[in-house]
Amino acid sequence: MAELYPSLTQCAIVATAFKILLFPAYKSTDFEVHRNWLAITHSLPVQEWYYEKTSEWTLDYPPFFAVFEWALSQLAQYVDPAMLDVQNLNYDSWQTVYFQRATVILSELVLFYALNRFIRSDPQPTKHLAHAASLSILLSPGLFIIDHIHFQYNGFLYGILVLSIVWARKQSKLLYSGIAFAVLLCLKHIYLYLAPAYFIYLLRAYCLDPKSVFRPRFGNAFKLGLSIITVFGLAFGPFVYWGQLLQLKDRLFPFSRGLCHAYWAPNVWAMYSFTDRILIPFAPKLGLPVNQDALTSVTRGLVGDTSFAILPEISKEYTFVLTLLSLILPLIKLWLRPDYYTFVGALTLCGYASFLFGWHVHEKAILLIIIPFSLIALKDRRYFSAFRPIAVAGHVSLFPLLFTAAEFPLKTVYTLLWLILFLFVFDRIAPVPERPRIFLVDRFSLLYITVSIPLILYTSLVHQLIFGLESSITPSQPLEQRIPSPVTSASHSSLRFWYRMSAKASMTP
């Protein structure tokens, strides 16, 4: 890989230096969430971790992530012991801030390692494509905004996902791929949305003969089953023994939360909410009944349901059925053609389905689409054409996470530079497909990107200048103005990729 320039290591060093400069930047309530989890796991016995509720930010990640926090707390006690006091709510000394920021960067070494393995796993003729895709993930505005300013550990988690995907490329490493994904599920359960693709792929490619489903490989099935049971046993076994499984279920799956998150993800339900608001002034003329209690209801991401004034209410069962239905064709394709590219494509479409139709979707869940899609976006120009609009819409939809004036130039300039650089490079190096592209659809993508630039400027800057700073952080105002554009783009991108995945043409290189 010596001929690939700039190298992954060089970019990682420069990016790390830049991230260190951001230590004093804005941090969200997620910073306090993770500080509180450090305190809980350090100060209390394991049996009390999922019962502690001194803070409203209770522990609601699976046990392996709690162990990860415990491991960090063993170092934190030497930096500032006060951060590990459960009663010390909203504690943010500079030592605490610097320590927690540094742990995000260090944990991202997992992603760096996984991307290195991804490049090495690619055949020599296409290694430059894998290198470009890896750089785009390493320098992702999504990880930059969510992890290094807003504050989370997504780089670490997506590193495990990428490593699992890389291992899925070779028959000899399929067992490791399944184990890595099981570990990932025990770290953060949002990746359950990707589980259907893993289940079908490992069943067809590892447990059954790829050439005939009637020839099971009992040895492989036993090894995979035993490995998965062992991973989940280590994670959840102690809590089963203590009779705390129902408590874990309530913490990990709080379905009492509303349909839409506080800062609405640009999905179908955000558009549904937007349409409901648009219909309110016309309801009397159209003779539509109005739910008066819903007129002042705007979800804030806390416990409670989203209400609609005009349109019917949406249940969590309904969102589950829609999500499942949207997965049927990609999973059938994966069953019939259990190869690497079909698998990653199915993973991406699982991300699309969960993001567009899921219950209480966080805007950060857009990375479930962008990260795996990035790994195959350069397979040919048709893949890239489907990737381009979601890359723009997905990253722009993260802007409301950083609403302070100081971070406006950071998020805007960094994201625009990334989009211009990588979309230009991807456009230049993406191979021309054997089958012709639909140029009318490509023009729609370019039109969306053109419209996005003034939309970003208005919602992030001009709106504040006209209506004042406070108005920019009200979810029902500028955020709603963004919704139709990103939702349209995300839906368009998913439909294009779904069509590409469902096509009869082979997806093997």
UniProtKB/Swiss-Prot annotation:
One of its GO terms (biological process) is protein N-linked glycosylation. GO terms for molecular function: dolichyl pyrophosphate Glc1Man9GlcNAc2 alpha-1,3-glucosyltransferase activity. Keywords: Endoplasmic reticulum, Glycosyltransferase, Membrane, Transferase, Transmembrane, Transmembrane helix. Residues 1-3, 120-142, 200-225, 337-355, 404-405, 470-509 are lumenal. It is found in: Endoplasmic reticulum membrane. The chain crosses the membrane at residues 4-24, 97-119, 143-163, 179-199, 226-246, 316-336, 356-376, 383-403, 406-426, 449-469. Pathway: Protein modification; protein glycosylation. Its EC number is 2.4.1.265. GO terms for cellular component: endoplasmic reticulum membrane. It is an enzyme of class 2 (transferase). Residues 25-96, 164-178, 247-315, 377-382, 427-448 are cytoplasmic. It catalyses: an alpha-D-Glc-(1->3)-alpha-D-Man-(1->2)-alpha-D-Man-(1->2)-alpha-D-Man-(1->3)-[alpha-D-Man-(1->2)-alpha-D-Man-(1->3)-[alpha-D-Man-(1->2)-alpha-D-Man-(1->6)]-alpha-D-Man-(1->6)]-beta-D-Man-(1->4)-beta-D-GlcNAc-(1->4)-alpha-D-GlcNAc-diphospho-di-trans,poly-cis-dolichol + a di-trans,poly-cis-dolichyl beta-D-glucosyl phosphate = an alpha-D-Glc-(1->3)-alpha-D-Glc-(1->3)-alpha-D-Man-(1->2)-alpha-D-Man-(1->2)-alpha-D-Man-(1->3)-[alpha-D-Man-(1->2)-alpha-D-Man-(1->3)-[alpha-D-Man-(1->2)-alpha-D-Man-(1->6)]-alpha-D-Man-(1->6)]-beta-D-Man-(1->4)-beta-D-GlcNAc-(1->4)-alpha-D-GlcNAc-diphospho-di-trans,poly-cis-dolichol + a di-trans,poly-cis-dolichyl phosphate + H(+). Dolichyl pyrophosphate Glc1Man9GlcNAc2 alpha-1,3-glucosyltransferase that operates in the biosynthetic pathway of dolichol-linked oligosaccharides, the glycan precursors employed in protein asparagine (N)-glycosylation. The assembly of dolichol-linked oligosaccharides begins on the cytosolic side of the endoplasmic reticulum membrane and finishes in its lumen. The sequential addition of sugars to dolichol pyrophosphate produces dolichol-linked oligosaccharides containing fourteen sugars, including two GlcNAcs, nine mannoses and three glucoses. This is Dolichyl pyrophosphate Glc1Man9GlcNAc2 alpha-1,3-glucosyltransferase. It comes from Emericella nidulans (strain FGSC A4 / ATCC 38163 / CBS 112.46 / NRRL 194 / M139).
